[in-house]
């Protein structure tokens, strides 16, 4: 059976792995998931990631980050989903926790943070909020 929302599955796997303090989490890989992982790494929410290929199936291995025994990612939630897509112009992209968190946005120029999308003046689909 195919998965209806692979990005929500990735976010849930990260959330669940952090609740049990796992060091790494494996997620089925795709271009969008790799781009989201790159944004999370650039913003300091994860230690790193790598793509592993095993028996023709590529897996995204994400190294989770903790500070003082607590997960760095306090909240990660899906915004736009297959049943209800959420698109915003560059002026309407929301700030997460007054700029302390990030909204991950997919634009015609790729996946980026809300701050970068506002700075470049382009809008897109709001994938998730991370704080």
UniProtKB/Swiss-Prot annotation:
<keyword id="KW-0699">rRNA-binding</keyword>
<keyword id="KW-0687">Ribonucleoprotein</keyword>
<comment type="function">
    <text>One of the primary rRNA binding proteins, it binds directly to 16S rRNA central domain where it helps coordinate assembly of the platform of the 30S subunit.</text>
</comment>
<comment type="similarity">
    <text>Belongs to the universal ribosomal protein uS8 family.</text>
</comment>
<dbReference type="GO" id="GO:0005840">
    <property type="term" value="C:ribosome"/>
</dbReference>
<dbReference type="InterPro" id="IPR047863">
    <property type="entry name" value="Ribosomal_uS8_CS"/>
</dbReference>
<protein>
    <recommendedName>
        <fullName>Small ribosomal subunit protein uS8</fullName>
    </recommendedName>
</protein>
<keyword id="KW-0694">RNA-binding</keyword>
<dbReference type="InterPro" id="IPR000630">
    <property type="entry name" value="Ribosomal_uS8"/>
</dbReference>
<dbReference type="InterPro" id="IPR035987">
    <property type="entry name" value="Ribosomal_uS8_sf"/>
</dbReference>
<comment type="subunit">
    <text>Part of the 30S ribosomal subunit. Contacts proteins S5 and S12.</text>
</comment>
<dbReference type="GO" id="GO:1990904">
    <property type="term" value="C:ribonucleoprotein complex"/>
</dbReference>
<dbReference type="GO" id="GO:0006412">
    <property type="term" value="P:translation"/>
</dbReference>
<dbReference type="GO" id="GO:0019843">
    <property type="term" value="F:rRNA binding"/>
</dbReference>
<dbReference type="GO" id="GO:0003735">
    <property type="term" value="F:structural constituent of ribosome"/>
</dbReference>
<dbReference type="Pfam" id="PF00410">
    <property type="entry name" value="Ribosomal_S8"/>
</dbReference>
<keyword id="KW-0689">Ribosomal protein</keyword>
């Amino acid at each position: 059976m195919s998965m209806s929302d692979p990005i929500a599955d990735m976010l849930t796997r990260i959330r669940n792995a952090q609740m049990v303090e796992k060091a790494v989490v494996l997620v089925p890989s795709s271009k969008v998931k790799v781009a989201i992982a790159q944004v999370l790494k650039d913003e300091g929410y994860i230690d790193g990631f790598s793509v592993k290929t095993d028996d023709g199936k590529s897996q995204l291995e994400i190294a989770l980050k903790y500070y003082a025994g607590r997960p760095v990612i306090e909240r990660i939630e899906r915004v736009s989903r297959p049943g209800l897509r959420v698109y915003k112009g560059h002026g309407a992209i929301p700030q997460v926790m007054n700029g302390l968190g990030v909204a991950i946005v997919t634009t015609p120029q790729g996946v980026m943070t809300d701050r970068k999308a506002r700075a470049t003046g382009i809008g897109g689909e709001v994938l998730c909020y991370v704080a």
